[in-house]
Amino acid sequence: MRCEKLDVWKRSARLSVEVYKAFANCKDFGFKDQITRSSLSVPSNIAEGMEKDSKKEQSRFLEIAKGSSAELITQIYIAIEISYIEKQIGLSWKKEIEEILKMLVGLQQKINSESEH
C-alpha cells in the first residue's frame, strides 16, 4: 500500500512540517536537531515500512515509528517546560501524536493479522 494513501502518514507528515516550522529559528541546535529528527522519523518509517514486501518488515518499521512518536512526546513536554513552544501548541501536538500512535497500533494489528493468514 502506498504510504500517501494512509491517513496516519498524512497526519504525521503534517505534524513534522509544523515542528520544522516552529523550530526553524531555534538557536539550540542540539534540541532542534533532536525534535525535528523525531518528528521526521515517524512518517519516514511509515513510508519505508509500507514499501516492504514482508508483513513482518512492515510491522517492524511501524514499531520504529511508534518509538519515534514516544520520543517526540517527551521532547514536546520538554519544549513546553523550557518555553521553546507555547503550551497550547505543545498540547495540541501531543494530542495529535497520541492519535497517530493509536492509528499506528491499529495499522500494525491489521498487518499482523494479515500475516497470520
Segments predicted by a language model, with ranges:
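Amphipathic alpha-helical assembly/interaction segments
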Residues: 1-117
